[in-house]
Structures are given as C-alpha cells and as structure tokens.
C-alpha cells in the first residue's frame, strides 16, 4: 500500500472521527490491519470499547468496508437500523463509502453507546466479560507517539495462522535497537486463572513470537506513523524484520487485597505475584526475553523506565516488598 492509497483511507477516517464526540475518543483505536491471510485487503479496523466496529480497506485498489456483527443489536435495537443502511449492497463502491461518511454524529453516538454497553455487560456470574478489551483499546489510543522511553502501539488483537494472538503489539526504541513488543494485558481477577492465566498466555505467546512474520508489522508501523503524523515517517522506518522481539506482560488496576473496598474485578498484589511466579517456573532456563510492566490505569503511557518495566525476577522482588508493607 502506497502513501496515496493510505491518504484516501485516512481522509475517510478523519471524516468519521469528526462525527465522534470527544468523550468517546479515549476508547476508540484505528488499528492497521490486513483483513485476510494473503494481505490483499489492507486497511484499518476501528475498535471501540474493545469491540470491532468497522473494517475500512482497499481491495484491488477499491475502497470498501465491513461493519459490526449483527449480534450487537441485543445491546441496542437502534444500531441495527444503522447497520442495515451500511450493509446495503446497492450502488457503486464510491456511493457505499458516501453512505458510511454520511452517518451522523447522533447515529455514531448510538453505535458507540451500544459498544460501551457490550463492554460493561455483567453476566450471570457477576463477571464483566469485556472490561479488559475496553481498557486495552484506551491503552492503544493513549500510546500512539513513537518516542524514546515509550512503547508505540501499532496493533491490537493480532492473530496469526496458528490462531495465537497477543492483546497488543508495540514498537519501541532502546538506544540504537528497535524492539517489537508482544503484549499480554491483565487487569481483572477473572483473567488470572485457567486458560486465561498468565502462564498459559506465555505458552501461546512463545508460539506466536516464533511464528509471526515481523515484516507484516513493518507495514502496520508505517501506516500508524502516517495516520498519526508521527515524526518517524516511513522514509525513516526501521527494518522490523531484524528487530529484537520481547514478550511483555502488562498489569494495571492492582489494589491492596486488605482494602475492604476492593471490587472482585480488580487485581490484587497476590494475584499478580502468583501469575508472574508461574511464568518464571515455565520459563526455566529459556532465553526468552520476558518483561513485566506496571501502569496505574489505562490512561497512563507505556513507559519503559525501570519503575514501569522490569525483568521477571525484579518484578517478583518488587511485588513481594509491596506485600510486606
């Protein structure tokens, strides 16, 4: 995809963004994506509150889109009417794009309200099923600048041919080194046990880490830089095929387990400590580059100083010291 093609896509993105009220923008993220395994459908996915709202892409040079799944109508009957307008197959490709860009601010508000309801829905077991995805979207939105000492997020919910997927993928610079960060995010107790536990995700991430072709991410990085007018333009882009790779476990919303006001959804120090110790045991003598990151909440930047990013062993020591206090 060349710069002219990306500009066409981004003009549509700008039109849509102008219809989204400021209060909602924190929880949206336009993510560079290839919509098929052959990389013939290249474009962007709009995530809102963790859910996939829209795929906007080029196919054989023609701009097209697909929209949210019909199942979201259970959270709002009104958005199903908007969906019916958008999936109308009549007219040329240009007319279909015109229908998309003509959706009003009021209708976009209905759509995003429905996605927020989906994210905050509590099932019969009193567990918020998509809370992490909602916060994950905000983290991706917040971390779009490519600066020394920070991780720039270039993709979320990335999936490869073997089906393994990190929550977020980022790029960072450390002196003269460029590093691809495969990030697994945890912020609730429900995501710390069973198949969702950190150690199980570590096993999956190792497979992804070895299987996924970093060249794909080079394209995502370039598109992300163009989209955000980043100083790291594609002309100066880095060869991500030869980038160093790391696995990162990111934790937020950690509370004191002795605090009586602690909600069941929030992580405790012990939750995180147990999870990281299991990772350490699974790592054994491997040379995998695994980092642990801590942020207060989804509004914080992903800084890579030693207060936020640590080795597995240092994270264990830090958490054990917190438990003693």
List each model region and its residues.
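Charged, terminal alpha-helix-loop-beta segments
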Residues: 1-325
């Amino acid at each position: 995809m060349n710069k002219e093609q990306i500009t066409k896509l981004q003009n549509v993105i700008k039109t849509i963004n102008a219809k989204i009220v400021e209060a909602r923008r924190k929880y949206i993220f336009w993510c560079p994506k290839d919509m098929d395994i052959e990389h013939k459908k290249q474009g962007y996915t709009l995530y809102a509150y963790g859910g996939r709202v829209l795929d906007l892409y080029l196919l054989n040079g023609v701009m097209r889109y697909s929209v949210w799944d019909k199942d979201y109508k259970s959270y709002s009957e009104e958005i199903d009417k908007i969906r019916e307008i958008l999936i109308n197959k009549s007219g040329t490709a240009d007319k279909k794009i015109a229908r998309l860009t003509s959706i009003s601010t009021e209708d976009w508000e209905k759509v995003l309200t429905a996605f927020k309801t989906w994210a905050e829905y509590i099932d019969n077991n009193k567990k918020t099923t998509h809370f992490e995805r909602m916060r994950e979207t905000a983290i991706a939105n917040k971390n779009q600048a490519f600066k020394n000492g920070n991780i720039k997020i270039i993709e979320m919910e990335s999936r490869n041919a073997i089906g393994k997927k990190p929550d977020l993928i980022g790029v960072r610079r450390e002196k003269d080194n460029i590093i691809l960060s495969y990030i697994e995010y945890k912020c609730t107790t429900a995501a710390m046990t069973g198949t969702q536990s950190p150690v199980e995700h570590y096993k999956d991430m190792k497979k992804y880490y070895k299987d996924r072709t970093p060249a794909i991410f080079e394209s995502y990085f370039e598109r992300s830089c163009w989209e955000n007018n980043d100083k790291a333009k594609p002309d100066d882009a880095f060869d991500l095929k030869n980038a160093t790779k790391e696995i990162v476990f990111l934790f937020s919303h950690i509370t004191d387990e002795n605090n009586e006001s602690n909600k069941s959804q929030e992580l405790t120090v012990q939750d995180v400590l147990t999870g990281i110790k299991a990772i350490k045991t699974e790592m054994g003598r491997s040379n995998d580059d695994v980092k642990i990151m801590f942020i207060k909440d989804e509004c914080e930047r992903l800084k890579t100083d030693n207060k936020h990013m640590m080795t597995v062993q240092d994270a264990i020591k830090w958490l054990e010291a917190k438990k003693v206090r």
